[in-house]
Regions:
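C-terminal catalytic histidine-bearing segment of alpha/beta-hydrolase fold enzymes
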Residues: 135, 168, 183-220
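Loop/turn elements at helix/coil->beta-strand transitions in domains of secreted/extracellular proteins
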Residues: 18-21, 85-87, 108-112, 157-159
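Cap/lid segment of the alpha/beta-hydrolase catalytic domain
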Residues: 1-80, 85, 93, 120-132
Length: 220
């Protein structure tokens, strides 16, 4: 949840120190909104399994409801006097990354996007016999229509950074493999003459948020 990056010297503080107005939220099933029955060991491997399965049974995927939570956060920011509505950005990390991608695609008020530790693609999950914590990102039959690289492609020309994409086990994916899987997105940005607006990169070990995202924070 948000508490992991909200401590002294964390990502949130670094953003604030660079002059950004930050709204950090725990979407449903994460952090402060996590179910009390989700024990640490179970949660580590299966994530918000109970919430995800309940959501699927009602025909409302958890990832979609989380995207809605993020859009409501954009509503809050847009209504504040100290926020320039033309400069709203979204940063989704780990389990918050996929719903942030959906939210940004559906809400053009989000002008640029950074996704750190996001599952590289749904297709990668199909190819792996073992995966960890993917239930909360599941959409039934999604690959009949699209995959995550297709969503990034549809974000063009808005700037998108993909940092430390992960495989279905949560391990860092090789940058070369990520580049291959996101060829469709790179083509979309290239056709829009904004090739530089899509960046796929690792986060150096020990690198601070400010060091990693200096260009992204300045990008307008």
């Amino acid at each position: 949840g948000k508490a992991a990056d909200a401590g002294a010297g964390g990502d949130v503080e670094q953003l604030v120190r660079t002059g950004h107005v930050v709204l950090s939220i725990d979407v449903r099933g994460m952090g402060e909104t996590r179910l009390l029955g989700d024990g640490d060991d179970f949660f580590r491997y299966f994530g918000a399994y109970e919430s995800a399965m309940t959501a699927l049974l009602t025909g409302n995927p958890l990832v979609g409801m989380r995207a809605l939570d993020i859009q409501r956060g954009v509503d809050v920011l847009s209504g504040r006097n100290e926020v320039d509505p033309q400069r709203i950005s979204a940063f989704g990390k780990e389990k918050g990354a996929v719903p942030t991608l959906f939210a940004a695609l559906l809400d053009t008020r989000i002008k640029k996007l950074a996704l750190e530790g996001m599952l590289v693609s749904y297709q990668s999950a199909v190819r792996h016999k073992i995966h960890r914590g993917l239930f909360e990102d599941v959409i039934v039959g999604v690959l009949k229509s699209f995959d995550l690289p297709d969503l990034v492609a549809a974000m063009s020309p808005r700037p998108v950074w993909i940092v430390d994409a992960t495989d279905p086990l949560g391990h860092h994916a090789e940058e070369k493999d990520v580049q291959i899987q996101y060829a469709v997105a790179q083509r979309s940005f290239r056709l829009a003459s904004v090739e530089g607006s899509l960046k796929i990169t690792p986060r150096r070990t020990g690198a601070s948020f400010a060091d990693t995202y200096t260009e992204w924070m300045k990008y307008k």
